[in-house]
A protein has these predicted regions:
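Short, hydrophobic/aliphatic alpha-helical segments
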Residues: 1-11, 40-43
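Conserved phosphate/anionic-ligand binding catalytic regions in large, soluble enzymes, centered on
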Residues: 9-26
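Alpha-helical support elements that line or immediately flank enzyme active sites
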Residues: 21-33, 155
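Non-transmembrane, aqueous-exposed alpha-helical and coiled segments at domain scale
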Residues: 32-41
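A structural-propensity feature for long, helix-poor, extended segments
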Residues: 41, 45-84
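Short glycine/threonine-rich loop-to-helix capping motif typified by GTGT followed
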Residues: 51-59, 101, 186-194
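Contiguous domain-boundary segments centered on the initiation and propagation of an alpha-helix
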Residues: 66-115
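A conserved regulatory-domain signal marking ACT and ACT-like small-molecule sensing domains
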Residues: 77, 91, 119-221
């Protein structure tokens, strides 16, 4: 157990699970969408639904969607900032079955017409898990430089992506592969030991059969 696990992150309170973690969920969801959300339909599950409003979970999620960090003093006023930014937000409750008690379903629409559905959980101490993207099961938290590649479920893509990273001396710490159905869309999540050069990311985006590439950089957090 690290000191971070005991003390938690630098944040605007009151709770590392219901506030700091919720901000990070919103922030990473915005990054995965790839642009500023213009609308967000958010459904809270379990403990988030029961006590989230009193702990500021709703405002924290919105703050993250606006690009705020857990220590941003504007978090308590995030609804006002969302209105100024032209972002429409609705809240409800959802039964996500066996999901972690501090979970939320976010259905996002972006200013460029993009749409995305994300299920995420706050695990405590500011740590989170992205549990599903557009119905495809995933499991990552953005605690190290992370590459999320959405591609066609066909042979060769795993080797191609790994080779691109190897050419830049980027070491892959963990790699997880997910797919909705055989031959459909698949998701690769690669957690790396160092930051990935922008030219490498652009090279991956230009590969045939790669549908979307998202990079979670620690330098941006």
């Amino acid at each position: 157990m690290s000191l971070f696990d005991i003390l938690g992150p630098v944040m605007v309170g009151p709770s590392s699970s219901h506030t700091a973690g919720a901000v990070r969920i919103g922030y990473i969801a915005r990054t995965l969408l790839g642009c500023k959300p213009v609308s967000a339909d958010i459904a809270l599950h379990g403990s988030f639904a029961a006590t989230g409003k009193g702990h500021g979970t709703d405002r924290a999620l919105v703050a993250g969607l606006l690009g705020m960090k857990p220590d941003d003093m504007r978090i308590p006023d995030s609804f006002s900032w969302a209105e100024k930014a032209g972002m429409e937000v609705t809240f409800g409750e959802a039964d996500l079955k066996e999901a972690h008690p501090n979970s939320a379903l976010l259905i996002l629409s972006g200013e460029e017409g993009s749409k995305m559905e994300i299920v995420a959980a706050s695990l405590g101490g500011g740590r989170i898990e992205i549990c599903a993207i557009d119905g495809i099961h995933t499991s990552f938290g953005g605690e190290c430089p992370t590459l999320i590649v959405r591609n066609l479920d066909q042979p060769g893509f795993v080797t191609g992506v790994a080779s691109e990273l190897s050419d830049e001396d980027v070491n892959i710490a963990t790699m997880h592969l997910y797919r909705g159905s055989r031959g459909g869309d698949a998701v690769m999540v690669l957690e790396c030991d160092q930051e990935i050069p922008e030219k490498t990311i652009e090279g991956l985006r230009n590969m045939e059969g790669i549908l979307k590439v998202t990079y979670l950089s620690l330098e941006e957090e």
